[in-house]
Amino acid sequence: MQRIAVVPGSFDPVTLGHLDVIRRAARLYDQLVVLVVHNPGKTPMLPLEDRVDLIERVIRDAGLPATVRVDSWGAGLLVDYCRQVGATVLVKGVRSQLDVAYETPMALVNRDLADVETVMLLPDPAHAHVSSSLVRQVEALGGDVAPYVPAAVAEALAVRRAG
């Protein structure tokens, strides 16, 4: 039986921390779906389609195996998507105790609803301080985001800023 895991997130934009979690999760599971989810509580900087395209490019540039794919999910519970693709694990990157506290109740509900386990991966210390919201803030103020995001993302944001 293939072990399928899902790495969900808004990835707005995808960061080096995200890539680190994706890379490590790809070694742990037979198939990995990087799932770009629509969060109705957030107004995204990048449209969903652009985020999917960027993650596909980042995964290709990183040389990750074909067992890693990208998808999107805009409606319904995350566990509904997991059922649809046969995934039994959600992989979440957690940078701090605050992230663990935020993720724990959702992990328990996901296990109750669909017997989907949540695995929390700690970040590479070099990226522990990086978040998409930090990148958005730096970018909005005209700062250099290259230290925090894959090259494809830095290029796309520079093009977007140039107009």
From Swiss-Prot:
Principal location class: cytoplasm
Segments forming a coiled coil: none
First-tier enzyme category under EC: transferase
Essential cofactor(s): Mg(2+)
Reactions catalysed: (R)-4'-phosphopantetheine + ATP + H(+) = 3'-dephospho-CoA + diphosphate
Residues that hold ATP according to the record: S10, F11, H18, G93, V94, R95, E103, H127, A128, H129, V130, S131, S132, S133
HAMAP family tied to this protein: PPAT_bact (MF_00151)
Protein name: Phosphopantetheine adenylyltransferase
Gene: coaD
